[in-house]
């Protein structure tokens, strides 16, 4: 399904076709991205490498500057600093990533209006907000964040408000070429 649809879409960045996978935090975007990357031989750019709790949705200029513009200018590899989410989070400071004919941008706000000139195919993972919150808190509690459950819940309450503002402003679900149900296995939806 995805290969056939992507074959009908032109690159907007020269030779690379970008797939954007959007949805709420905890919706299942990363799962969809990993499945597609394996199927399509694509590299995944994670919005989480740019976003943070302090700047959950307005990090987009960094992606244009460090991802879309270099690829449009013919870059064969990307290199960009990675943000830090948690007190105990010590990721590799820089991401070095090859550019492939298909690239996937995965994360909350991946279908924002500022990215649309670069996106060949948009996917929205539609999952009820309460399910997303439950999944997100559960994930964050197991990630050695250095934070208490109460602190994580407070961050998620703020996060949902930021997502609501973005969703109302940019309406990513309406822009998506494909909407998948984040509560069902992707393979079941492709049959």
Language-model features: where?
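Conserved beta-strand scaffold positions in the cores of enzyme catalytic domains, especially
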Residues: 18, 42-44, 122-124, 177-179
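P-loop (Walker A) phosphate-binding loop of NTP-binding proteins
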Residues: 24
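ATP-dependent NMP and nucleoside kinases share a basic, alpha-helical "lid"
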Residues: 89-142
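Conserved nucleotide-sensing/catalytic segment adjacent to the nucleotide-binding pocket
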Residues: 43-105
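Conserved lysine of the Walker
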Residues: 29
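Small-molecule kinase domains that catalyze NTP-dependent phosphoryl transfer to phosphate-bearing small molecules
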Residues: 145-191
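Extreme N-terminal, non-catalytic leader segments
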Residues: 1-19
